[in-house]
């Protein structure tokens, strides 16, 4: 049995919260383990002057941590699952999917306005093309802009800016105790979340069987099935976290329901569909459901929309 575990994490306040949460859960189940954190700076933490959609997104917040994992300098990595590319590097595996926080997005506005109350031509801050596409589909008058940085930095920059509102994930806002700043929690029929939003993905080396078994105590089957369905859909569409794709799955008593959205950046074109499957009793069946819905979206024209976006 291992005596020490080293967790690799980004150094942002939210990433540290996630790593400390993981450490606490593992310590509770394995009190004999000496668990340490190793802080790692990622490309996404350094390149703050460009929109995420312009940088490219294949492992922007994960690749540097994965290098340390492959080099055996850390034993596991804790990621926001929505930041994890759908293809993991050779030799690595997502060994646990934690219970999800609320997956919805929220509006933070200067004077408490909700989506309907925001003034005409309001300036909205978000670094997500998924949010931009869905919001412009509802409010084409909005002027969309970008605020980068960790959550604390974004709140500071927002308060000092001329933006009227910004859109964030409820999970991060709640975890860092900014809940009192929320003007509105947006329902899924308004804004579908990012694939994997609200869950943590715990990554290990495939050949490190001891660590894989240790982190299994944090795996939530509901979360695993739902996020694997969402990630399979994204992978089949060859999308990334900076492509306007939203997805949300629920799982109860063997029945998996998956909703998805693909849209143009300007919000003028949007494709939505959903699927319900019974007797989903294995992760592979959840992934198969995601692929099936991706195929339906392609038949509806998702490929054409995504091809146009990739040219931008």
UniProtKB/Swiss-Prot annotation:
Q: What class of enzyme is it?
A: transferase
Enzyme Commission code: 2.5.1.61
The biological processes this protein is annotated with in GO are: chlorophyll biosynthetic process; protoporphyrinogen IX biosynthetic process
* Cofactors demanded by this protein: dipyrromethane
SUPFAM superfamilies xrefs: Periplasmic binding protein-like II, Porphobilinogen deaminase (hydroxymethylbilane synthase), C-terminal domain
Mind naming one GO cellular-component term on file for this protein?
cytoplasm
* Reaction equation(s) it catalyzes: 4 porphobilinogen + H2O = hydroxymethylbilane + 4 NH4(+)
Lineage: superkingdom: Bacteria
Recorded hits in InterPro entries, A to Z, give: HemC (IPR000860), Porphobilin_deaminase_cofac_BS (IPR022419), Porphobilin_deaminase_N (IPR022417), Porphobilinogen_deaminase_C (IPR022418), Porphobilinogen_deaminase_C_sf (IPR036803)
Q: Does the keyword Cytoplasm apply?
A: no
Q: Record's Pfam families?
A: Porphobil_deam, Porphobil_deamC
Question: What keywords is this UniProt entry annotated with?
Answer: Chlorophyll biosynthesis, Porphyrin biosynthesis, Transferase
As given in the record, the signal peptide range reads none
Q: Please give one Gene Ontology molecular function term for this protein.
A: hydroxymethylbilane synthase activity
* Family of the protein in this entry: Belongs to the HMBS family.
Subunit structure of this chain's protein? Monomer.
What does this protein's UniProt record list under function?
Tetrapolymerization of the monopyrrole PBG into the hydroxymethylbilane pre-uroporphyrinogen in several discrete steps.
Q: What else is known?
A: The porphobilinogen subunits are added to the dipyrromethane group.
Protein's UniProt name: Porphobilinogen deaminase
Identify the species of origin. Answer: Prosthecochloris aestuarii (strain DSM 271 / SK 413)
């Amino acid at each position: 049995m291992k005596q020490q575990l080293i967790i690799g994490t980004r150094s942002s306040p939210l990433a540290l919260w996630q790593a400390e949460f993981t450490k606490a859960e593992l310590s509770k189940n394995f009190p004999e383990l000496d668990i340490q954190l190793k802080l790692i700076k990622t490309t996404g933490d350094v390149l703050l002057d460009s929109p995420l959609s312009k940088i490219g997104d294949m492992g922007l917040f994960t690749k540097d941590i994965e290098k340390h994992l492959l080099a055996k300098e850390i034993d596991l990595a804790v990621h926001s699952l929505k930041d994890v590319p759908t293809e993991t590097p050779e030799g690595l595996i997502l060994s646990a999917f934690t219970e999800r926080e609320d997956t919805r997005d929220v509006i933070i506005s200067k004077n408490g306005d909700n989506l309907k109350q925001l003034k005409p031509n309001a300036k909205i801050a978000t670094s997500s093309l998924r949010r931009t596409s869905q919001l412009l589909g509802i409010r084409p008058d909005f002027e969309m802009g970008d605020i980068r940085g960790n959550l604390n930095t974004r709140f500071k920059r927002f308060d000092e800016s001329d933006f009227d509102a910004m859109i964030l994930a409820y999970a991060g806002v709640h975890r860092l105790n900014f809940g009192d700043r929320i003007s509105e929690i947006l329902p899924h029929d308004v804004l579908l979340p990012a694939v994997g939003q609200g869950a943590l993905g715990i990554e290990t080396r495939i050949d490190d069987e001891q660590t894989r078994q240790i982190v299994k105590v944090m795996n939530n089957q509901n979360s695993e099935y739902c996020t694997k369905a969402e990630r399979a859909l994204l992978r089949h569409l060859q999308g990334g976290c900076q492509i306007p794709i939203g997805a949300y799955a629920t799982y109860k008593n063997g029945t998996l329901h998956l909703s998805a959205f693909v849209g143009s950046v300007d919000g003028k074109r949007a494709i939505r569909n959903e699927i319900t499957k019974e007797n989903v009793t294995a992760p592979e069946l959840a992934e198969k459901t995601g692929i099936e819905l991706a195929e339906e979206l392609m038949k509806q024209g998702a490929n054409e929309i995504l091809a146009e976006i990739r040219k931008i």
